Amino acid sequence: MKNEINAVLENMTATTPEPEDYTGEDGLLYCGKCRKPKEAYFAPDKAAIFGRDRHPAECDCQKTAREEREAAEKRRRHLDTVEELKRRGFTDPAMRDWTFENDNGRNPQAGLARRYVEHWEDMRTDNIGCLFWGGVGTGKSYLAGCMANALMEKEIPVHMTNFALILNDLAASFEGRNEYISRLCRYPLLILDDFGMERGTDYGLEQVFNVIDSRYRSGKPLIVTTNLTLDDLRNPEDTAHSRIYDRLLSMCVPVRFTGDNFRQETAKRKMESMKKLITD
């Protein structure tokens, strides 16, 4: 047993020299590259404990190599975390490509979306959400996806979904409605895309209200995209819609999206590319 302990202590206090290393005038081993010591002397009282007068020290080369290894490991863990967040956070893999880097820069609200992300801690503390409203194809969903991607790159969990999927999940959920909604509300940011497109049954409207009301009570920000107009939201057709819209407008700052229909432009560009391929 004593021999085993001595062997462990020997490994702990020994330094393995490289061919270019050398012994300095102080008797310590030095790195042949950076000329810094790879050993240091124990204090006299410690030397008696370990049976040696010196222990390994980190030269500049070793320090640089260690820092590079640590940085690579930190980067790997970060990428793994972001990958898991995006796997859980997006309901459509295509949303991963909805990033500020891929944005064409033509949407006038892109600056607002970027600033929201930059000031996320303030937005979260003050519970400030956004309601992106406007015509079809004006980039509402895309910019919401950009915000989600940017926040997840900062390792902030975000969930982007829509009520069509939520209602289907609730109908098929084995964990129970309350637990499912609670899970949605645990995300620091929840994004509800294409609001107003879900079926308007009494059951559907009740579940929509339950989700939005639960999010309201959680005190966490909500971002909503919708093709409904602000007038539609402020003048609902009935009580069921009124209490839903009232909650939304109390949680989210309305942001209007105007301009060209980017989807039509994309479709036109694809058509022109296809024609060119066919005719060439």
Regions found by a protein language model. Name each.
Residues 108-117, 148-189, 199-206:
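Short glycine-rich substrate-engagement loop in P-loop NTPases that contacts/grips substrate
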Residues 194-195:
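Walker B catalytic acidic pair
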Residues 124-144:
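Walker A/P-loop nucleotide-binding motif
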Residues 127-131, 158, 189, 221:
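Residue-level preference for the first positions of well-ordered beta-strands
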Residues 1-104, 267-280:
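A short, basic N-terminal segment
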Residues 88-91, 96-130:
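Pre-Walker A (pre-P-loop) alpha-helix and adjacent loop at the N terminus of AAA/AAA+ ATPase modules
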